[in-house]
Amino acid sequence: MGKEKIHINIVVIGHVDSGKSTTTGHLIYKCGGIDKRTIEKFEKEAQEMGKGSFKYAWVLDKLKAERERGITIDIALWKFETAKYYVTIIDAPGHRDFIKNMITGTSQADCAVLIVAAGTGEFEAGISKNGQTREHALLAFTLGVKQLIVGVNKMDSSEPPYSEARYEEIKKEVSSYIKKIGYNPAAVAFVPISGWHGDNMLEPSTNMPWFKGWKVERKEGNADGKTLIDALDAILPPARPTDKALRLPLQDVYKIGGIGTVPVGRVETGVLKPGTVVVFAPANITTEVKSVEMHHEALQEAVPGDNVGFNVKNVSVKELRRGYVAGDSKANPPKGAADFTAQVIVLNHPGQIANGYTPVLDCHTAHIACKFAEIKEKVDRRSGKTTEENPKFIKSGDAAIVNLVPSKPLCVEAFQEFPPLGRFAVRDMRQTVAVGVIKAVNFKDASGGKVTKAAEKATKGKK
Amino acid sequence: MKVEALDKFWADKSRYDLAEKRFYEGPQKVTDRSHYSPLVSEIAKAREHIQNSLEKIDGVTLDDGLNSELAKRLAQLEGEHKELKTQVSLLNELLTATVKRLETQLKLTNGVSKEPEVEAKKPEANDDDDDVDLFGSDSEEEDGEAARIREERLAAYAAKKAKKVQIIAKSNIILDVKPWDDETDLKVMETEIRKITQDGLLWGASKFVPVAFGIQKLSISCVVEDDKVSIDWLTEEIEKLEDFVQSVDIAAFNKI
């Protein structure tokens, strides 16, 4: 694996019976992740059992069985390579708690892959109104996953097999479906595939001579190709936000003998270097970073995606906590929010939400109760147009612009500026009842707070 | 180290094979009414009990005004649906009868013609329109014919699916458990975590991963049945071990 390839994350969504795990498995098996010895072992077993002709199925089954036992925690199981990218693939589970993870979790997807099954009735069941697929697709779009690929799977089991008519029918239906969510179908690659047999996965299939390839039109440049892997290669690479201001939400804070206080977190935007004078919002504590480490190795520079620990002087472990955000004191430093305005989509609340509702919000690593101070307007999710001013209440399926007030000091940002700090899950009764993206933040005045001697010295030294 | 070895090389494969064999033999032996049965019946009882109490809980949550009204409406709709279905099948019968009659009559009068068939199909589609509304389809642009085809396919699919064994949806999760400092004994922490048990939860492999400045975290994988185990519950349970655990983060969350 050379170092020149860019890393991207994709999330695979679709009905449980869409064959998305088979498709995911196919990609990982053929292009990645699983070490050669494991595959060779399973392939040999298949031969010995006289299942040579079903070698592929056998290996996939074995890998699944291995996952079910949880006997490996190798994250490589979910990685593969294309010509251009290293890909980490998330096979979206149906588990209800997955939604929260989609929002606060470690990897924001750069592209979503929607898998639908071409089999009679299977497609229709898969994209039914109440399906989880719709919810996942809607969430992906809301959370800023603007690229989409559609795999029309199980083409081998359409009637008749590899039917062009069926493919066109599904393509039309899915186009209107994703358009309702907000995607532009012209910018979406549609590929007829069989994850099981491998048609149009890595190589163009001879079973579908009618398929002339997929095409996408987008302002960053058009693309075309024939296979699913081509479509993955045509994903626009994410702009890694190193040129933005530093934002590092704290996960943990350690006190280490002989070293001192060590906050740990992931750099979301910007860079962190030894010597940076950082401020921790919302507590507004300023100090100097002595050194930065990742996996026990000293770093001269931590970039977005790096999970790092850094050593700060004159700050006690009690002054910092999970949910605080570190930023550069001299370049657009983070501040506490007095209140903020967000677009909230109610997913699955049993009753009605009115002004005064105070659930817990999970935003980056923070976990703080916030009050729905004012539900300003109900809006059309797609266009953002107001459909009702000052609604008395909102319920499942509604989108609304809401003013929220945190019950304790909290640091958040507008989604436009700092996406990972600008999206949140609304938790109530151990469920994700709503999700939101922050439109604007009314920051508190950053007066008061503590400036350590180390910070003073570092600042003076530079003058 | 041990774990890494497991990753690459399956030394105790025979043990797993044996375990797998036992697992698959298990249910069959039970049907033989062997010595397993008291335990099995005990489990069955417990399951029933859980099922009952769950149903009761459902009942309770359904009790607030809005939902019971919904339930009523649902029941009503279901009734109507049944009624309409019978009516539709009646109409179908009538229709085929008429078509036959028409055909024979037409044959008698002026040979074979396809027109009556076309005419006959139209009313059928209209009949089914009522059915569509019942399914709560609110997309106005959809014409009756398309909806009918969709419903037919769904029905065929449902029938096909009913025959298939339902697969239990599971997820594979990797949790990062972080200690307080470099002095926390991760081994004891792990032992304590593995003591957390729950129906549908299976602990998997684990390893210690360096974080920074001599601190290590525990990465532990588990497999959960989606309907049985809440990940919030699980992280809360782990965070209750507050002598050891500072925080829990989800490193990976995938469908199996």
Swiss-Prot record, chain A:
Region (G2), start-end ranges: 70-74
Protein residues bound to GTP: 14-21, 91-95, 153-156
InterPro entries named in the record: EFTu-like_2 (IPR004161), G_TR_CS (IPR031157), GTP-eEF1A_C (IPR054696), P-loop_NTPase (IPR027417), T_Tr_GTP-bd_dom (IPR000795), TRAFAC_GTPase_members (IPR050100), Transl_B-barrel_sf (IPR009000), Transl_elong_EF1A/Init_IF2_C (IPR009001)
Region of interest (G4), ranges: 153-156
Record keyword Protein biosynthesis present: yes
Residues with the 5-glutamyl glycerylphosphorylethanolamine modification: 301, 374
Subcellular location, record wording: Cytoplasm
Keywords: Cytoplasm, Elongation factor, GTP-binding, Nucleotide-binding, Phosphoprotein, Protein biosynthesis
Spans annotated as G5: 194-196
Function: This protein promotes the GTP-dependent binding of aminoacyl-tRNA to the A-site of ribosomes during protein biosynthesis.
NCBIfam families according to UniProt: EF-1_alpha (TIGR00483), PRK12317.1 (NF008969)
Family as reported in the entry's similarity comment: Belongs to the TRAFAC class translation factor GTPase superfamily. Classic translation factor GTPase family. EF-Tu/EF-1A subfamily.
Name of the protein in question: Elongation factor 1-alpha 1
Source species taxonomy: Eukaryota, Metazoa, Ecdysozoa, Arthropoda, Hexapoda
UniProtKB/Swiss-Prot annotation, chain B:
Cited SMART domains: EF-1_beta_acid (SM01182), EF1_GNE (SM00888)
Keywords assigned: Elongation factor, Phosphoprotein, Protein biosynthesis
GO biological process terms held by the UniProt record: translational elongation
Alphabetized Pfam families for the sequence: EF-1_beta_acid, EF1_GNE
Domain of life, source organism: Eukaryota
InterPro entries xrefs: eEF-1beta-like_sf (IPR036219), EF-1_beta_acid_region_euk (IPR018940), EF1B_bsu/dsu (IPR049720), EF1B_bsu/dsu_GNE (IPR014038), Transl_elong_EF1B/ribsomal_bS6 (IPR014717), Transl_elong_EF1B_B/D_CS (IPR001326)
Descriptive protein name: Probable elongation factor 1-delta
Organism: Drosophila melanogaster (Fruit fly)
